[in-house]
Amino acid sequence: MSNKLVKEKRVDQADLAWLTDPEVYEVNTIPPHSDHESFQSQEELEEGKSSLVQSLDGDWLIDYAENGQGPVNFYAEDFDDSNFKSVKVPGNLELQGFGQPQYVNVQYPWDGSEEIFPPQIPSKNPLASYVRYFDLDEAFWDKEVSLKFDGAATAIYVWLNGHFVGYGEDSFTPSEFMVTKFLKKENNRLAVALYKYSSASWLEDQDFWRMSGLFRSVTLQAKPRLHLEDLKLTASLTDNYQKGKLEVEANIAYRLPNASFKLEVRDSEGDLVAEKLGPIRSEQLEFTLADLPVAAWSAEKPNLYQVRLYLYQAGSLLEVSRQEVGFRNFELKDGIMYLNGQRIVFKGANRHEFDSKLGRAITEEDMIWDIKTMKRSNINAVRCSHYPNQSLFYRLCDKYGLYVIDEANLESHGTWEKVGGHEDPSFNVPGDDQHWLGASLSRVKNMMARDKNHASILIWSLGNESYAGTVFAQMADYVRKADPTRVQHYEGVTHNRKFDDATQIESRMYAPAKVIEEYLTNKPAKPFISVEYAHAMGNSVGDLAAYTALEKYPHYQGGFIWDWIDQGLEKDGHLLYGGDFDDRPTDYEFCGNGLVFADRTESPKLANVKALYANLKLEVKDGQLFLKNDNLFTNSSSYYFLTSLLVDGKLTYQSRPLTFGLEPGESGTFALPWPEVADEKGEVVYRVTAHLKEDLPWADEGFTVAEAEEVAQKLPEFKPEGRPDLVDSDYNLGLKGNNFQILFSKVKGWPVSLKYAGREYLKRLPEFTFWRALTDNDRGAGYGYDLARWENAGKYARLKDISCEVKEDSVLVKTAFTLPVALKGDLTVTYEVDGRGKIAVTADFPGAEEAGLLPAFGLNLALPKELTDYRYYGLGPNESYPDRLEGNYLGIYQGAVKKNFSPYLRPQETGNRSKVRWYQLFDEKGGLEFTANGADLNLSALPYSAAQIEAADHAFELTNNYTWVRALSAQMGVGGDDSWGQKVHPEFCLDAQKARQLRLVIQPLLLK
């Protein structure tokens, strides 16, 4: 049975054969339509509560059959469902005890369990039999009524009061059915058979948790005898973007005489901008309002207008509908995309709908947090990867100002990409198979019909990672003809250039910046966007600056970082990843790619993004401000600027608010007011910050949007103060002074005791470290294999020599070691100790004989775990690495040591602070201070060692026995072009053959 035949007549009986028929994807559904809101009165409209909508959300009854063998005839009115359990709608079944969540990326969930090919489905196909009892609201009694499922995964059969209603697929757009003739005023029984798998599952192979259920709202929609079925509003700009034009196309259910309408356009204050009145003589209402006095919509200035359409019969209001619109022009000219005449750069992120507790049943609170945090992080665009989101999300993007790529629910990644990235499209769908055209095209149509009125949506995307073929070419043709006001996108053609015309954008995933530059400098025909880039898995997003530097090329129009939020599911207070639910096959921690953690707290990566995505580019040089205004529509005078002077990390001066007026796209140099600073005062930081001048929906007045600083560097140098007493015994060297004692083992070659005021600070022998707990990117790049020789090299260093030398104001203890790795000379550590207990440590690495990379070089110290607090002067407040310094600034920062551990889904290298001048660890009794000695110092203080972190699969497995200090001369970058092969960029790597030196001073921290 083809879907064409299904649509020609009403089908009264369900058929399980539909589950495996790609040509049957909707049965008895009504045509998709706009997501406008309708009300029965003016009062309802103003309150925002409609009596024409009845929610069926809440507690439903359910029988869950893992094997797909559910109760027979459960949909019958007289069926006994007293043994059914309770389930929440909206909600994912697997998070409510029905089945288990499963995380896979490319592979299908059944891979290795059954050998099946499209459109076959697994023999084990879980079935959820849902039941909901309800009484019909009185406002519905005299109206036509539809039943709408906003999101259901994956295939649903629907019955009402024993009557078959219809069938739906496409998990992420509504399935809506007319149910008027089946309804009763009271005691209605709605039954839904939801199957986890159908032929549609081959088109829904997105990189996410595979979960099922009624995960979006279920509602009844009442339709008065005069009813707005569909509304298309094309809001554009004319007269050099100074005036507005509104083209109105309304489809009205017209069943009454003497019908009329009134259309109003109102601004954000509710004031009338324009109106149109007239009779209704047919189901189609079309007209244009021109020369409207409107302000343009953009992400910078999201000016919205409310269109209200009133429907009357003989002068009585039967229905009023509303839709927010933004007037804007989005155009593709000469291979470049323009918004309202300005070349646009997308500073974007990909975003899954995800909540760590609720799965895909996310809340309005989740959405608002995401959007506000994006705006505060200078993110101006979001790609709905890889399916249409809830309608509310687009309304919020319209309101707060985000540019959107809306993407059809279509991904068949596992049908063509095989192990190791090998491509084999032999059973790729939809490909060239016309049996899949209807289902594929319906997904695009459903999305466009629902979302067409949202100003925030600039680009329609056909889907994700599904290769290419004639079906996509047909889809692209439909999109461009149906909506010439937007640009059409599809990245999959990069794998089959025969279908290059199926996208208007040159879109690539994870292309290195140098590869992109080659395209941009060779007569590009299309605009370029990195639709996925800077893979943010774990400790990542290194060298994002290489990509933002491409903005100088007109055809480079930005990109979308993968991705926004870690997909970690919470259970028993812990965040878990693939495999933790005994789900197999699985792709484990690959679901942890977020700029924010799964609990919606910000990761350190986000500060880097905020700095590099800023529309105000600031540079302080020679005391002057170099300012570039990359906004498209906002003068820099809309912000105020502050200059601040810091000496040794302490604020000594701050200016009054300053204003610098640059039009969008302009650059300028401005003299700044600075007080005189004597050279001997210390290290001086000249800082400029840019702030919001007024409250905005996403941040308050004074919020910092950008900053920059110039440092007149002055690193501390060790100067000994008096000589300690020396006790040179057979097995140990002892050094004593005023209230301190240090003991060096002549056998081990390390200090074995460090006491200040009688307190022991060394809990274990120090060790050399050349390693770090592997990051997700390290694992993906193969560094665990390539650099394995360094993992335990420091642990097994062998003492070659130890000696001491008495100097006038200090005592030198010199040690030399060999490693199980061939070096160009001895590995040495020199300790210069003065009479006050200060220890200047100098560790020299001579370089390895064999070429290769060195992860890090420095020392590990195990200190008392009671040292729970830190305070330091260096780059902060976040962890930083040589390829991810942006967004951190010199200052004095403090907090709890445990907070230095970033909770990546799988534990890995974390907590490093760069350009440290001094670092204090303490409790109420005192502590230690580590100070740079004439050279940059990297330092981390954590409750766990690198070895513990490396061995752990989850943070909750770690135990805190000591406070671990890693003092490093250098550490390689974290990388981030991708997480499955790309190496850290060479300029951020450490050459193992190069000599390195660590210099720092350790001294007691005395608290008053």
UniProtKB/Swiss-Prot annotation:
InterPro entries: B-gal_small/dom_5 (IPR004199), Bact_Beta-galactosidase (IPR050347), Beta-gal/glucu_dom_sf (IPR036156), Gal_mutarotase_sf_dom (IPR011013), Galactose-bd-like_sf (IPR008979), GH-type_carb-bd (IPR014718), Glyco_hydro_2 (IPR006101), Glyco_hydro_2_AS (IPR023232)
Any single GO BP term: lactose catabolic process
Presence of the UniProt keyword Zinc-finger in the record: no
Enzyme class: hydrolase
Any coiled-coil regions, as ranges: none
EC number per UniProt: 3.2.1.23
TM segment ranges: none
Name of the protein in its database record: Beta-galactosidase
Organism, as annotated: Lactobacillus delbrueckii subsp. bulgaricus (strain ATCC 11842 / DSM 20081 / BCRC 10696 / JCM 1002 / NBRC 13953 / NCIMB 11778 / NCTC 12712 / WDCM 00102 / Lb 14)
